[in-house]
């Protein structure tokens, strides 16, 4: 399967998109523009939606993107903006699927939604940990038939807010929106020495619904809970989201 790749940057939204036909790039850009407009207009009238670190209630008549982010915030007990990157990845892939795209991978700062017709490996990036670039998650094609979310939060890498010190907290869910908010929430509990911090994260993960599993890396230590894809060895030193192999 040949993939076409393009980086799409519109204001703060920076997407790495891989698709099986370049015609889908324009559709993805239109999705970003339209959904950003919906979100920005709502935030202009309701600035608390942008700044809150706690869940925010919204009325029934809000744009779908606002509703989805708010629901994810309540599910993980974080502010709605904790789900923003995963939300754009998911909405892009959903729109492409509706337009008969068979293979699409949307990555937004480590927050991924993908739908592939073949088994696919997504590489792990966990900062300076020795596990970074040496492990990957092998997803079965059946898992991705309607799209699947893999989202990562880090307290040591990137500009996103995390109150913990995990090198990576990767969450797996049918929804990248749910996974993104959950990764942020779980990552906030990565406090203390490595083993204790990992246990704190896994205990928090037990209380979050709608997720399949979680994989946490702090330094040379790792832990998991729930069902995660098969771990395989990889030698690619690349950012999570940049390592995609169809097998």
Swiss-Prot record:
Gene3D superfamilies cross-referenced by the UniProt entry: ApbE-like domains (3.10.520.10)
Superkingdom per UniProt: Archaea
Disulfide-bond pairs as recorded: none
Annotated SUPFAM superfamilies: ApbE-like (SSF143631)
Family as reported in the entry's similarity comment: Belongs to the UPF0280 family.
NCBIfam families from the UniProt entry: PRK04334.1-1
HAMAP family, sorted: UPF0280
Protein's name according to its UniProt entry: UPF0280 protein MmarC6_1437
Organism of derivation: Methanococcus maripaludis (strain C6 / ATCC BAA-1332)
């Amino acid at each position: 399967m040949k993939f076409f790749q393009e980086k799409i940057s519109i204001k703060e939204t920076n997407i790495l998109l891989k698709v099986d036909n370049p015609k889908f790039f324009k559709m993805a850009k239109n999705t970003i523009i339209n959904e950003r407009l919906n979100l920005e207009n709502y935030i202009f009238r309701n600035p608390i939606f942008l700044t809150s670190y706690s869940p925010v209630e919204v009325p029934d008549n809000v744009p779908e993107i606002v509703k989805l982010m708010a629901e994810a915030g309540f599910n993980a007990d974080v502010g709605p903006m904790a789900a923003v990157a995963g939300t754009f990845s998911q909405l892009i892939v959903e729109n492409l699927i509706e337009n008969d795209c068979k293979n699409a991978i949307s990555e937004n700062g480590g927050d991924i939604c993908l739908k592939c017709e073949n088994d696919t490996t997504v590489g792990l990036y966990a900062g300076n940990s020795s596990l970074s670039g040496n492990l990957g998650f092998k997803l079965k094609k059946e898992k991705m038939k309607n799209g699947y979310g893999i989202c990562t939060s880090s307290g040591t890498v990137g500009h996103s807010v995390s109150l913990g010190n995990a090198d990576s907290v990767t969450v797996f869910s049918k929804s990248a929106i749910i996974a993104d908010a959950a990764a942020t929430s779980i990552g906030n509990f990565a406090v203390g020495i490595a083993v204790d911090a990992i246990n704190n994260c896994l205990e928090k993960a037990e209380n979050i619904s709608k997720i399949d599993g979680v994989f946490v890396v702090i330094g040379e230590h790792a832990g998991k809970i729930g069902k995660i894809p098969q771990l395989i060895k990889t030698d690619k030193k690349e950012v999570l989201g940049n390592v995609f192999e169809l097998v």
